[in-house]
UniProtKB/Swiss-Prot annotation:
It comes from Petunia hybrida (Petunia). MYB-type transcription factor controlling the production of volatile organic compounds (VOCs), including floral volatile benzenoids and phenylpropanoids (FVBP), in flowers of fragrant cultivars (e.g. cv. Mitchell and cv. V26) by regulating the expression of ODO1, a key regulator of the shikimate pathway, and of several biosynthetic floral scent-related genes (e.g. IGS, EGS, BSMT1, BSMT2, PAL1, PAL2, EPSPS, DAHPS, CS, CM1, ADT1 and PPA-AT). Binds to and activates the promoters of at least ODO1, IGS1 and PAL1. It holds the Pfam family Myb_DNA-binding. This is MYB-like transcription factor EOBI. Residues 121-170 are annotated as: Disordered.
């Protein structure tokens, strides 16, 4: 383990993972004396840890009301809503998610949601394979045929005859959508659904 000497009191300060014994000491001390000034709490409890280390261990892992388990899709939507409203104010967001810590929410945002946002941005910037193939086909056809070849071979009457003959045998069935916005999904709607889908899988 990493150990260093604190010059002011010559006490070895322990770093690294917490042991079960240290966890029990901290839990019992807080149960008997309550939370207080974390630096003095660490010394009084007999822990060779910094006050900050004790505070973070208690708040993020040992508190009885810390919620265990994965963040639910409902919590994810709430995190996204609140982040849109308040930005990276993790403590403020955590107050609206009982049992979740600001650190847990921040880590979830950075590893899951922000990652999806970056991927979506990259996908929006990259042309799809179909678009790339269309561009290749257009550039290939333009290179192989000169502009005079296509103009000379075009005949409006032959185009109309072929189209009319083919259209006689086609019948359309079903209702076609009208131009309303009620059935149109925004990119934000689709993105939220994708995140929910990923969270449940």
């Amino acid at each position: 383990m990493d150990k260093r000497t604190c010059n002011s009191q010559d006490v070895e300060v322990r770093k690294g993972p917490w042991t079960m014994e240290e966890d029990l000491i901290l839990i019992n001390y807080i149960a008997n004396h309550g939370e207080g000034v974390w630096n003095s709490l660490a010394r009084s409890a007999g822990l060779k840890r910094t006050g900050k280390s004790c505070r973070l261990r208690w708040l993020n892992y040992l508190r009885p009301d810390v919620r265990r388990g994965n963040i639910t899709p409902e919590e994810q939507l709430l995190i996204m809503e609140l982040h849109a409203k308040w930005g990276n104010r993790w403590s403020k967001i955590a107050k609206h998610l009982p049992g979740r810590t600001d650190n847990e929410i921040k880590n979830y945002w950075r590893t899951r949601i922000q990652k999806h946002i970056k991927q979506a941005d990259q996908n929006m910037k990259k042309p799809s394979k179909c678009e790339q193939n269309d561009q290749k086909a257009i550039s290939t056809s333009q290179a192989s045929t000169g502009p005079t070849d296509t103009i000379d071979s075009y005949s409006p009457s032959s185009y109309t005859e072929n189209t009319n003959n083919n259209m006689e045998n086609i019948t359309f069935q079903g209702n076609f959508p009208t131009e309303t916005n009620e059935n149109i999904w925004s990119m934000e709607d689709l993105w939220s659904l994708q995140l929910l889908n990923d969270a449940t899988n």
